[in-house]
Amino acid sequence: KEGKNFIPITQTWPADLETPLSTWLKLSEKDSHGVFLESVEGGESLGRWSVVATKPLWEAVCCGKEIVKTWNNGKTEIHTGDPFDILRTWTKEYKSSMINDLPSIGQLYGSWGYELINKIEPSVPINEIQEKNIPYGSWMFFDQLVVFDQIKRCITAVVYADTSSLKDSSLDEVYLKSISKIQKTRNLMKVPLKEYEFLDWNENENLNLDLKSNWKKKDFEEAVLSAK
């Protein structure tokens, strides 16, 4: 479509012999960086959609005052500023379109800690970040996804073809490359699921943990009384 540079290429097939969990276990076996998301209705009932994604195009991690972007080829970029503004700038580069029969699934997934609430609500006080090497925000941007439709019992593999720097003569090559990625995903899903050993639960096991409180007992008791 005109003005689009991140074109979704899809294939759909029956999901009779697969589940979202089995797919996640197969696709994430050699790449643990990914997401497995389930939609939920009313906070209780399992929803219609499940999304499995591995091998992010790039990852972004906030540490201290920096946000580090790491591409899937190992190249890194270091930026400073508001992480949300930076993420908006990065994602604006990708102009895509909705996919028929699929919800607006997005491609940027991640999590962030309390330290970033100040970027949204400046009046909320936060403590100065002490550990500069501990991430307080982490995101992954995907150009390939697997989407389960629990009602129609079908799987849709999505690969986004980047046409931003291509000429018309190379569009066929990009399309075939996207189809090849989908086929690799399907081949991985055909592999039998390996056996997993479950951990034995021992409720009587005693662990010797070296714990040290960062509160004095007196201060803790006073805080409890104040909360009451």
Q: Across the structure, where does each feature detected by a protein language model lie?
A:
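Short, hydrophobic/aliphatic alpha-helical segments
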Residues: 87-102, 220-228
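Conserved phosphate/anionic-ligand binding catalytic regions in large, soluble enzymes, centered on
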Residues: 106-115
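Short acidic (Asp/Glu) patches
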Residues: 83-98, 122-133
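Extended accessory regions or peripheral subdomains of proteins
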Residues: 1-34, 39-77, 114, 118-228
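Active-site metal-coordination/substrate-binding segment of hydrolases
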Residues: 80
